[in-house]
Structures are given as structure tokens and as C-alpha cells.
Amino acid sequence: MGMSSERLERIDNMLKQSLVDNTIPGAVALIARNGKIVFHEAYGNADANGKKLKRDAIFRIASQSKAITSTAVMMLWEEGKFRLDDPISQYIPEFKNPKVLVNFKYADTTYTTRPANKEITIRHLLTHTSGIGYGAIDKDERMKMIYDKAGTIDLFTTAPVTIKDVVLKIAQLPLHHNPGEQYTYSLGLDVLGYFVEVISGMTFQDYLLKHLFIPLGMNDTNFYFSASKSDRLVAIQHKVNDRWENYPNTFYDVNYPIEGAKTFFSGGAGLSSTAKDYATFLQMFLNGGELNGKRFLSRTTIASMMGNQTGDLYGGGDQYYGLAFGVLTEQGQAKGGLGSQGTFIWGGYFNTQYFADPKENLIGIILKQTQGSTGDQTSWKFKQMVEASIDD
């Protein structure tokens, strides 16, 4: 497969050493080259009680959901259902006449706005340039407070709420900035999950199952799981006095994928998956939109998705943002250890990372479930060492 077995062993040793160093409680790592899995191992524990992690463990992939949502949007785009530069208000009228935040009073959370200078488009939502906020995890304290007061549920919930409920609330809230002028990580992909429902006439979950997960054979990827799979869900852990403990409920319920109402199909952060399933999704992209004889996207569409959509608004020259992923530039490749130019990259809130290198037909995925500071170095080491294991 063009990978050095000795160098793959170094990766194995690095991950084992990370357990010894106590910087991770456990991980599943997968490497694929030329469409074949060459490395797929589980390390450490799935919870703080010593349950062993297995290769088919299910992880909350959080923001790794975004690329899947973008893919669904582009599949509908290929059907001629809309244009990328259509205003979202054409399909969700509540987004008409967006407003930008001007002044905010911390004392009583009142604020003033001004009209935005343009409408939010579907492209803005795909590229995190809409100006929409990110609620509980927004970097701007004012936005956190505005979203909290409005009662938006941003992510990871067991409550009986739908994405429509939340998206219609988001539509009434102020933007960080005029659409298209800055990159601000946002709930835009949650808006697009509801957009998929509007365009397709199906629930977002049903659309993904019918058009992506079932045809791709991604049988362990979903928003919610039944009791038969619940024991495969990895616990979120954090360090307390240098010991790993199961993470408590905070602004979200840690068991959201297996408990509660199971009605919130969050396109931005709601999915859980396995390393093998996510590798399957990425391989479809490396194959130019096809897998196992089934066509999901045209290679011409993928070329647009991998193109620079954000200019210099994102990535500081090493990366730009396309329509679904961060994409490595020539400058990023020159830095070393990140992959070839065109490598696409993202990760998730609970310490999951992936990259796919089209030039080398190479995929690397490393999944953990942690919160807080742990001293974890596996993300950069894994990427650097995987690329260095190419041997052809």
C-alpha cells in the first residue's frame, strides 16, 4: 500500500506512550492509503471505569458533522434546487433583513443593531462568513448572552426540540458582522440542516440516512442510537488531579446520543460515528465523489468545494476554507507535517481530528473523547508521522 510497516509501528508506539504519559485516556486511530485501511487500532479505555476501547467504538464527532451537512447541501445543489448565492431568506423567510449587533449593555443584555448591508446567502452559511453566532461556545461574550437569553439550544441536547425551532430563533438574532466580510465559526451548518429539510421535504436525519449513510455503508453514523449500540458510545473524560474521570453534565447532557427526545438533528455538531465510517466518507471525496460504484457528487462539484471560498479571511496563509473543509495551501505544505497542498482537514469539540490528502490518496483519523487541558500531543504527532510513513 506504499506505507512503511516500520514507520506505522512508530505511530503505534507513540500512541501507546501517550497512554503511559497519561495525556489521553484512549483513542482509536485509522490510516487508509489508496482506498485500503493499512492501520486501525484501539488504545486505552472507553470510560473511567476501565472498559477497554474497541475499534468499532462510537465517538461524538461534533464539528466533523459539518462536512457531512455540506455534502448533503451540495448533493441537492447538483439537482438544480438552488444557487449558492441565493439568499437563505428565499427558502427560510425569517432570515429576511438581517441586522448586525452595534451596542450591548451587560447590565440588562439589551442591545442595538443596524441593518446588514446584504442578505445571508447559502454560500455564506457553508463558509462561516454569514455573521451568525455560535451560542454557548461563541468567542464573543455578548453573543453568548444574547443567544442564552433567546433560549437557543446550540448543540448536544436531550431536550424535545427540533432544528426548525432553533433555526427560527437564530433568524431573529443579530449578526457579528455584515455577511461575507469576516470568517466567524457559527451555527450556519445547523441552519443548513434545516434548509435540507425545507428543500427535500424529509427530516435531516432521514435525508442523510437515505442519500449518504446507507448507500455508503456508514451503518454506525447517526444523530441518535438505539439501546443495541449504546454500550459502544465512548464516555467523555477529563483529568481531575491527574486521574481520568467521566465528564459530568454541564451546559449539555453527555449522553445526548443515546438518551432523551432524540429530535435535534444538528448539522453543525450532532452526529456520532466510528473511525471506519468516517474514513468511508472521506474516501468518497478522495475518489472524486464515488464509492463502491455509487456516485454521490461529481468531481467538478468537489473541485468547487475544495476551492478557496474565503480569500484570506481564514487560515493565515497555511489554509483556506472551502465549502466543507479547511484546505492546505502550498505555504501550508511547505511548513511540513501537515500534508500535501490540497489536503482537507477538520476536527471536533471532543478532541477528534482527521485529514485526507488527495495527492497521496491518504486518510488519517484519530478519535478521542476528552474535555479540558490534558497535555495531549497526539493530534499533531499523528498527522506528522502518518505523512512520514509514506514509502513509495
List PLM regions with ranges.
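Extracellular/periplasmic catalytic domains that process cell-envelope and extracellular macromolecules
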Residues: 23, 51-53, 83, 113-119, ...
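Short, conserved catalytic-motif segment at the N-terminal edge
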Residues: 2-61, 81, 100-105, 256, ...
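Short, surface-exposed beta-strand/loop micro-motifs that present aromatic residues
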Residues: 343, 350-363
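Short, conserved phosphate/pyrophosphate- and ester-handling motifs at nucleotide-, phospho-/glycolipid
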Residues: 4, 66, 274
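A generic structural motif
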Residues: 44-45, 251, 370
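Short, surface-exposed loop or secondary-structure junction motifs
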Residues: 99-338
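Structural recognition of the beta-strand scaffold that forms the well-ordered cores
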Residues: 28-30, 40, 124-127, 184, ...
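Active-site SXXK
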Residues: 12-15, 35, 59-88, 96-97, ...
